[in-house]
């Protein structure tokens, strides 16, 4: 198999079996719109086929171990991710830390006292879609560490009717129990504004850079790492308010 990322604005997908997950059903129920994948999503491809017209299709999975749905999408919409792309950034540096500033909605990466990376992010939202204040979406303030990393992950939460379920979230670095993570974001481009349900939203490019720079480092296959199992060292994540 191989990892591949969507490189077009969107691509319609075909369902071979399943269709039971919330993200798929909600798309069908939303005016009968076709299920789609979007730019920046990352999937594990484990089969390739051609149709009667000679067009190549990938079978895409929400993560390395597959999922409840069996999906096919035109291969031309994807760029295969080569194993060389997962080479760690500055692996020889031991003193690394990530600082997420909730007030300014920024993220910085430090090697010692030197800032080597800076970007805008979107952390936990302060208001819901109706403008009502919310507290349970706040990104947890404090000193944490990256505990699990995934090249791609299907993430979900919330309650029935008001929940969310999204596959193919790339370059995910979890740093708080419960799934709070730095990860790629394909559903908005409003960075610098509080938008998430607690995670640190970043562009696909920024999330990938942090993923490759921060420990623990991840191998191509299976594309995941858990320090509770491997015992590997990990990078500190400081979430501050100003």
Task: Label each region the model flagged.
Residues 6-17, 78-92:
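Intrinsically disordered, low-complexity Ser/Thr-rich linker and spacer segments
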Residues 9-55:
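Beta-loop motif signature
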Residues 49, 62-64, 104, 111-113, ...:
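A mature extracytoplasmic/lumenal domain signature
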Residues 53-55, 100-105, 167-169, 232-233:
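A short, compositionally biased
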Residues 81-127:
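A structural motif detector for short, solvent-exposed N-terminal "entry" segments of globular domains
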Residues 91-93, 117, 128-129, 134-141, ...:
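Exported/periplasmic cell-wall-interacting domains
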